[in-house]
A protein has these predicted regions:
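Active-site catalytic-loop/activation-segment of kinase and kinase-like phosphoryl-transfer enzymes
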Residues: 92-143
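Short, surface-exposed acidic
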Residues: 42, 209-216
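ATP-binding pocket architecture of kinase catalytic cores
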Residues: 2-95
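Active-site activation/catalytic loop segments of kinase-like enzymes and analogous catalytic loops
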Residues: 28, 183-210, 221-249
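Short helix/strand-bridging catalytic loops that position acidic/His residues to coordinate divalent metals
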Residues: 60-64, 174, 188-191
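Active-site acidic catalytic loop and adjacent metal/ATP-binding pocket
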Residues: 1-5, 139-185
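Residue-level preference for long, well-ordered alpha-helices that form the structural scaffold
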Residues: 19-22, 66-69, 101, 105, ...
Length: 252
């Protein structure tokens, strides 16, 4: 049976992967959490930290379709969040907390927004929200703490990190951002990164109670703007990001 081997070198000191211990966290996820998480993830055959970095030997899901139906994804995420509500941070105290490395994200956003703001393809609502977030990213990150009980979250629940089997089963991959924060954080990022605004209400309804979504959307917008900065102005990818960010701004 073919395997997928994922190797990560030692992160550069002072970078976000270094500050968050992202690569080590994924190793620990597969060692400690994956067997009991309650969601489908790739089977893990090896999860080690070495002198050179980390190595994972995982089930090969290359035959599965990239992405997932967002309604199904919302249902799967909600089930995991309910399962581990108020339990995850006690069972795995090493999980990343709310506002981890917020100062580094603040600095990165300030540098990026100064360049991104000049793009002509931004909607005025996005420009206004980006301006409002400048110098307040740390505040937005800490606001997440009031969005609900802490639980196990994927941390990067975009469609890029989901796979669908030929018979419709959904798997979550790439657990480098696994955290213990309010579950609505996963919903906010899935919407902002991946879901057509026309389906947001449908997806939110499938997730269930999400009354604090507006509280966490500003932090999701920060990450979305950083992602938008990596696109070419006027490209299809940029326009998709702008559409979703505009919806997030409208709901913030």
């Amino acid at each position: 049976m073919p395997h997928y081997v994922k190797r990560r070198g030692r992160p550069v000191p002072g970078t976000i992967p270094d500050a968050l211990g992202m690569f080590q966290a994924e190793v620990r996820f597969y060692r400690e959490i994956a067997p009991v998480a309650g969601v489908r993830v790739p089977a893990c055959y090896q999860a080690d930290e070495t002198d050179d970095g980390t190595v994972l030997v995982l089930e090969d899901l290359s035959a599965w379709r990239p992405g997932a139906d967002p309604v199904l994804a919302a249902t799967v995420l909600a089930g995991m969040h309910r399962r581990w509500e108020e339990r995850a941070p006690l069972r795995w105290p090493w999980l990343r907390p709310v506002a981890a490395a917020a100062d580094l994200v603040e600095r990165l956003f300030s540098q990026t927004w100064a360049r991104l703001r000049a793009r002509e393809d931004l909607a005025s609502s996005i420009t206004s929200l980006g301006d409002a977030l400048t110098g307040r990213v740390t505040v937005a990150e800490h606001a997440i703490a009031a969005a609900g009980p802490l639980t196990l979250v994927h941390g990067d629940a975009s469609m890029l990190n989901m796979r669908t089997s030929p018979d419709g089963e959904l798997a979550l991959v790439d657990w480098e951002d696994v955290s213990a924060v309010p579950g609505v954080v996963d919903l906010a990022w899935m919407l902002t990164s991946s879901v057509d605004p026309a389906r947001w209400d449908e997806v939110i309804a499938a997730y269930g109670p999400a009354g604090e979504l507006a509280r966490v959307l500003p932090a999701a917008v920060v990450q979305g703007l950083l992602s938008l900065a990596d696109t070419t102005a006027g490209s299809a990818a940029a326009m998709d990001w702008i559409s979703r960010l505009n919806e997030a701004a409208r709901r913030t």
